[in-house]
């Protein structure tokens, strides 16, 4: 019997489905983008935040073109469901990133949801916002597999050196 892994074959799909169909996916992304522009930091599942990230970056690129650009205005009008946020995009967010090319958002993993479905959660935010900074997760490098193996090797070497020192210190005297 041959064991095989079920491969996730996309068949040309280059984005996540995120719901019931393409229309609900677009509505979800529009609502998430509107919330991100309004609050500059939102909490969502990892998949939704990761999928929305590219659209948020592209929206800032369009915002940097200015409110006189017809295509930029059409994109802002489509993606932002609350029309009072369009001036914020062009007058607050776009000037903040004027000298920067890309990488306008930061995404951090937060603890999984507990009460519902244990979904992997994330916080996505625009960089340079007015909110207090998020604490960056501190990773204890002593707990990685490689460092644990190196620690075990060092302990074995010390144990072997101690054992060889004890055996060389004991001098056997010939019996007479």
Curated annotation (Swiss-Prot):
One of the record's GO cellular component terms: mitochondrial inner membrane
Stretch forming the transit peptide: 1-8
Keyword tags: Mitochondrion, Ribonucleoprotein, Ribosomal protein, Transit peptide
Pfam families linked: Ribosomal_L17
Main location per the UniProt record: mitochondrion
This protein's record includes keyword Transit peptide: yes
Disulfide bridge map: none
Classification via PANTHER family: LARGE RIBOSOMAL SUBUNIT PROTEIN BL17M (PTHR14413:SF16), RIBOSOMAL PROTEIN L17 (PTHR14413)
Annotated family: Belongs to the bacterial ribosomal protein bL17 family.
Name of the featured protein: Large ribosomal subunit protein bL17m
